[in-house]
């Protein structure tokens, strides 16, 4: 009878530990999703912010990241 009681206690501890680990995993997944969404938003803005990258049509040098506009933004 004592062995059965000990076995049940060990099983209960293992199950509660597993439940805690699973909950922690869910929180980590949510944190990872938030982190990746922030990175995606930064990538959508472009490497240098709101300026245009190379070979993009422009009207003024201030539109280009390089500050060099000759109908298209130049890299340098």
Swiss-Prot record:
Chain residues in the propeptide: 20-45
GO molecular function annotations of the record: ion channel inhibitor activity; toxin activity
Keyword Hydrolase on entry: no
Keyword Secreted: yes
Localisation per UniProt entry: Secreted
Tissue expression summary: Expressed by the venom duct.
Pfam families: Conotoxin
Signal peptide range in chain numbering: 1-19
Keywords for this protein: Disulfide bond, Knottin, Neurotoxin, Secreted, Signal, Toxin
Example of a GO cellular component annotation carried by this entry: extracellular region
Superkingdom of origin: Eukaryota
Disulphide bridges: 51-65, 58-69, 64-73
Comment text on domains: The presence of a 'disulfide through disulfide knot' structurally defines this protein as a knottin.
Homology family: Belongs to the conotoxin O2 superfamily.
Protein's recorded name: Conotoxin LeD51
């Amino acid at each position: 009878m004592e062995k059965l009681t000990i076995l049940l206690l060990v099983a209960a501890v293992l199950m509660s530990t597993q439940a805690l680990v699973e909950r922690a995993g869910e929180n980590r997944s949510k944190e990872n999703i938030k982190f990746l969404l922030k990175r995606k938003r930064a990538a959508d803005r472009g490497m240098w912010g709101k300026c245009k990258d190379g070979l993009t049509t422009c009207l003024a040098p201030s539109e280009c990241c390089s500050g060099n506009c000759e109908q298209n933004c130049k890299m340098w």
